[in-house]
Amino acid sequence: MEGADLLTAGVLFLFAAVAAVPLAARLGIGAVLGYLLAGIAIGPWGLGFISDVDEILHFSELGVVFLMFIIGLELNPSRLWQLRRSIFGVGAAQVLLSAAVLAGLLMLADFLWQAAVVGGIGLAMSSTAMALQLMREKGMNRSESGQLGFSVLLFQDLAVIPALALVPLLAGSADEHFDWFKVAMKVLAFAVMLIGGRYLLRPVFRFIAASGVREVFTAATLLLVLSAALFMDALGLSMALGTFIAGVLLAESEYRHELENAIDPFKGLLLGLFFISVGMSLNLGVLYTHLLWVAASVVILVVIKMLTLYLLARLYGIRSSERMQFASVLSQGGEFAFVLFSTASSQRLFQGDQMALLLVTVTLSMMTTPLLMKGIDKWLSRRLNGPEENDEKPWVEDDKPQVIVVGFGRFGQVIARLLMANKMRITVLERDIGAVNLMRKYGYKVYYGDATQVELLRSAGAEAAESIVITCNEPEDTMKLVELCQQHFPHLHILARARGRVEAHELLQAGVTQFSRETFSSALELGRKTLVSLGMHPHQAQRAQLHFRRLDMRMLRELIPEHSDMVQISRAREARRELEEIFQREMQQERRQLDGWDKFE
């Protein structure tokens, strides 16, 4: 693709995303399905703006690559060892069982047994990009079902290596083309990457960070991710697996959070590009001529994978309310099928339109997942939040609460218990099914659902409530809720949890003045105790704590992100000097009088 064509394609991609995703969100079908529909619209079978789908699809795999790097950063070798049972137990069982059943069905559909085996393995894989995105949207990341889902996806990525090696063997070209020496060299190169990364990455990033130039650090991060992907691709292995390993090697480093921040903007854009490319690859011509075959294949694929996953989740001990979410989020075909089927086609394993039919099936199955998740979400909401008497029954009992608490994790539980102890009428909304079930056993009135949906807030009593307390784990969810409340329920008094200064600035800019930084108060209290342990009078330590709190809040309001770094540094130094002067005056005053105790907040 030439430079001008690449620029035109970039503009078309951005326009399609900007137009389709907000529309999809308004319709409630999710961003992923919006990207897929946008791809269909601008692809060769839609308006025909872009025809070179294969090249763009290969480039767009970088979205999955960046996503896997960030996932690797969130894990460490000890955590992977803890997940070994779910990775090599449930993950292996899912791939083998699904592949065996699907391969048998493909043989009944007149596929050669070699092609059926490859087809079964490819269809057994799920979409890492789609599943992880949906799990994040549905708040499954921290749940038991989400952890198990990640383990299954990780095993599928690991299975890429033997699956690709199996293709030439099935094609009967092992003696002519399959070079075991090359395989051994690939394994050796892979081992060198592991060992080199283990001992070299930290010193390299320490040297780069010492320069103090953030742009260079970002460039080094991109270089690491792209180099790992290119290296694995040259070996004929999964690019995503290579960057995942690089992330794991850096998971325990002091640069973990900075690396994640540097990559995050690129990940989101490239993931969107990946889903658009998948939509573009949908061959509507094959769909039109084999409509019944494709429709039946999609249904059979989704049902078989859901049944397999549901059974494994039950054997693993996942709660019944979480099994359907786990089974549905992994029910689609995945991006690995495109790679595996292309390799098999080059070995002439498929006949006629067989490869095209399989690819259309995979693409359409990916489009069913967001809709399936939405339907299961509604079913779970009604099931967990009370029996359904008629179609108009709200998801949440409307008992006209005074306060709505969103999120019932450790942070939200303390707030809810305090409010209930003071006889306040509250409604708690939580999207982690496991947490809902557990808290209900203890007698808490917790309801399942995604609070970023206006309908759920309305049925929870937002129109009659006085306040809403937002304690979401994800800052994006917090800001989305703030926007929804300001737009649809402007009378609500909004109180929110901020994970740090960045989130606090965002809340202030959105007009939310009542918030709490989750570690700030506890850190101040421990600091006060430290001052007392060093010999300071308790009254003086208390006043020091209060002065620090007030000055820090004032700085938070003044040092908004628009200021330059130099202005922020200058103002921070000025504030530190001001704080020291206040403490000096307090010291002199306390020496004169330490009898009385002032009223403190």
Swiss-Prot record:
SUPFAM superfamilies documented for this protein: NAD(P)-binding Rossmann-fold domains (SSF51735)
Cystine connections: none
InterPro entries: Cation/H_exchanger_TM, K/H_exchanger, K_H_efflux_KefB, K_uptake_TrkA, Na+/solute_symporter_sf, NAD(P)-bd_dom_sf, RCK_N
UniProt KW Ion transport keyword: yes
Compartments reported by the entry: Cell inner membrane
Function recorded in the entry: Pore-forming subunit of a potassium efflux system that confers protection against electrophiles. Catalyzes K(+)/H(+) antiport.
Entry's family note: Belongs to the monovalent cation:proton antiporter 2 (CPA2) transporter (TC 2.A.37) family. KefB subfamily.
Protein name, entry field: Glutathione-regulated potassium-efflux system protein KefB
Species the sequence originates in: Salmonella dublin (strain CT_02021853)
Gene name as annotated: kefB
